Each structure stands twice: as C-alpha cells, then as structure tokens.
C-alpha cells in the first residue's frame, strides 16, 4: 500500500496546521487521490495490522440500513461507541441515507437497491451514485458522514468505484474506508456479474491529528508487504444476502498494530 504511505508522507511534508471540531488540531492538505487495482490484491494496509472484522461488520451494518449500534456490539465491534446515545442510536447516519433517504412526498428512497437495478439495466449510466450527505438531516446525525458519496463505473465488463471523502482521518479512518469500499466493490461486482476494476479514493480535507504524528512517523519507517486477496462466497447472488462468513482474507501479512487515540 505504497499509495497510502505516499499520502501520509505528503501530509507530513506539506500539511498546514489547523484547529478542528475536536480541539485536537490537525495537519491538513486539501484534495488528494489514490487509485487501487483490485485485481492486484485487496487494499488492506500492511504497515500496521488492521481489524478486518470491524470493517466487514460495519459494512454489513450499513447495508442493513441500521443506525443503532446493537448489531455492532453483538459482534464485538466498538468503533461507533463514542458517538451513540444511551440507547445506542446515532440518528439518520449512513445506513438510513443509503437505504431509506426521505423524499419530500413522504416516500423513502432505497439508494442501494436502486443502484443495483440500474447497474443491471443500464450499466453505462453516469448516475450510479449513492450519497450519504443529506443537508436537511445533518444536525440530527451523531456524526455527519465523512465518506459522503460514491459512484460506480462500468467499462469492459469491469466495475470500478470512486469514493469522495470530505473529511479523512489518515491514520485511523482512511485504512478502514479504503478496505470497506474496496470490499463493497467486490460484492457489487459479484452480484452484478462483473469483474472488479479499480477503487479510487478521493479525499477533501486530508489530515493527521496532532496526537497521531509519532504513530504516523513510525508507520512511515515500515516497508509495505504484499497485498492479501479477498475471497467471496460465490453462491451469494444478492447484495443483501452477504454474511460475515462469506468473506475470507487470504495471505494477509502485516506489521504490528499501532495504537492511537480517537478524536471525538
């Protein structure tokens, strides 16, 4: 994952210090892009060990349309704990916007189901887009969406995905986001009868928190290892039928985990 280390190095060398919502402070650049060929391996960071279980369960949780952390807690995933209320609710976050976007006439739009239908009927469409950024409901969300919008693209029988991430916590968040959307692309490709193409990550405010600099510098001393591969259960033909057991990460080698505090 040289691309990821290049981003981290770029921010260390060119980042501007900015204050932020959490009061921690960041070193930030605006606008950056990384490209990953999904045929060359599954883009899971190898310069520190990543928790794939959390990535998979979070994605399945999004696809369920859920906005309560009960499913995550049931499966030992704590990444949303800091933002949930006493009942485990997060407000109308990702899952709600993906699966139940409220329309002015009272309908709810299932963006994911619509996307899958459009992919099969008109794969050349330039409208293969899902947005989590709903300005009318931002204030009701425990945390506004950082990965705000993604678009699929089909060419030569291959499915590619581009994500726009408005706010990118490079050390803690971005490795999760890359792996999550790469996995989503593999899942959608299988169900749509396509081959995986590229995952393209586009970041807006790309930042390292001031209390992550030591960890980032340690990671930059490490040499990337060969990428693993991700196997999906070929029997799954519907996107919403995937379960945790349908994924197998093969050949993942990684340097030791690096701990860092979460800015809330």
Swiss-Prot record:
InterPro entries: Thymidate_synth/dCMP_Mease, Thymidate_synth/dCMP_Mease_dom, Thymidate_synth/dCMP_Mease_sf, Thymidylate_synthase, Thymidylate_synthase_AS. It is an enzyme of class 2 (transferase). Pfam families: Thymidylat_synt. (6R)-5,10-methylene-5,6,7,8-tetrahydrofolate binds at residues 51, 169, 263. Keywords: Cytoplasm, Methyltransferase, Nucleotide biosynthesis, Transferase. It comes from the Bacteria. Its main location: cytoplasm. DUMP binds at residues 21, 126-127, 166-169, 177, 207-209. Its EC number is 2.1.1.45. It is found in: Cytoplasm. GO terms for cellular component: cytosol. PANTHER family: THYMIDYLATE SYNTHASE, THYMIDYLATE SYNTHASE 1. Homodimer. This is Thymidylate synthase. It comes from Pseudomonas paraeruginosa (strain DSM 24068 / PA7). The gene is thyA.
């Amino acid at each position: 994952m040289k691309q990821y280390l290049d981003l981290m190095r770029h921010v260390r060398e060119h980042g501007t210090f900015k204050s932020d919502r959490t009061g921690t402070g960041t070193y930030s650049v605006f606008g950056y892009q990384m490209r990953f060929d999904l045929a060359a391996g599954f883009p899971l960071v190898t310069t520190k060990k990543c928790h794939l279980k959390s990535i998979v369960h979070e994605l399945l949780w999004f696809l369920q349309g859920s906005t309560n952390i009960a499913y995550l807690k049931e499966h030992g995933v704590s990444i949303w704990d800091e933002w949930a209320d006493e009942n485990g609710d997060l407000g109308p976050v990702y899952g709600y916007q993906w699966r139940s976007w409220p329309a002015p006439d009272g309908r709810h739009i299932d963006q994911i189901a619509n996307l899958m239908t459009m992919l099969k009927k008109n794969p050349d469409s330039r409208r293969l887009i899902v947005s989590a950024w709903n300005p009318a409901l931002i204030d009701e969300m425990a945390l506004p969406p950082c990965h705000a919008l993604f678009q699929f693209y089909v060419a030569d029988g291959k499915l590619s995905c581009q994500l726009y991430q408005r706010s990118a916590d490079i050390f803690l968040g971005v490795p999760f986001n890359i792996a999550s959307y790469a996995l989503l692309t593999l899942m959608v490709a299988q169900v749509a009868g396509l081959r995986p193409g590229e995952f393209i990550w586009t970041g807006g405010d790309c930042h390292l928190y001031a209390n992550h600099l030591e960890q980032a510098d340690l990671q930059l001393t490490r040499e990337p290892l060969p990428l693993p591969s991700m196997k999906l259960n070929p029997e799954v033909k519907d996107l919403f039928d995937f379960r945790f057991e349908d994924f197998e990460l093969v050949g993942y080698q990684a340097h030791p985990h690096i701990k860092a505090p979460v800015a809330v």
